[in-house]
Amino acid sequence: MNKFFFIVSGLFFLNSCGVKKVTNTDFSNSLKKPTEIINSVNSNSNYSKWLSLKGRAKIVQKNQEITVNVNIINRQDSIIWVSAKGPFGIEIIRSQITPDSVFLINRINKKHFTKSVLEARELLKVDFSFYDLQDIITANPKILKKNYTLKSNREFFHLIADSVSYLVTNTYKVQNIKRLTNKNTLEITLEEYLKEDNFPRKINLKVEAGESFEATIEYSKVEFKKPKKILFEIPNLYNEEN
């Protein structure tokens, strides 16, 4: 497992919380402005203090493909914690992100990774913060304020700018995000929202940054507002990944 795969796998697992209110939209008026869409999406966010997710993740990089079971815990504005387990429930990676630091434990190679968020972002060549990641995990992605071209139909709004685009549903949920930074591309898709909690059961991430990387998580269990015990301890015998 190379360094890129080690870092990106952990970051994605790190790679959602509140229940969003569904808004009925009248598409008979096609003269929507980009600012209206942006304000509707960004004001529609609703966070829960705690979010717990369980599911399966498929990760593809180059010719490698792995499928793991994942547990994700998000404590709002504080910690994103993830455990990824392989066959027979054996843990492969445990990771933790705070607003300023990234920690990963690789059980297979008996190594750990500790970097500032800024250092990790530079290594990955992706402009993504703790809060951006939290917004994706909690299904509350924000739309950056830029000059957009707007295309729409009865189901979607499509906001397009030079370096970013958003596909927004008629209930003001962001379904797809594409970002381009220094020829590196990041694409995120949130799908299969359930009516009872208005939360996506499937998230797909694609990264093109010298090497291609794709990960898809399908959630089987979603819990809101239930506090969880978070454990993260680096074994003394593990070496640090530089």
Predicted regions and their residues:
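An acidic-aromatic
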Residues: 80-130
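Short beta-strand segments
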Residues: 66-68, 91-93, 113, 184-188, ...
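C-terminal low-complexity, charged extensions that often adopt amphipathic alpha-helices
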Residues: 123-152
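Short acidic, glycine-rich loop/turn motifs
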Residues: 57-63, 84-86, 106, 179-182, ...
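Start-of-domain marker
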Residues: 21-100
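C-terminal motif of bacterial Sec signal peptides marking the signal peptidase cleavage site
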Residues: 13-16
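Gly/Pro-enriched, hydrophobic low-complexity segments
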Residues: 20, 146-242
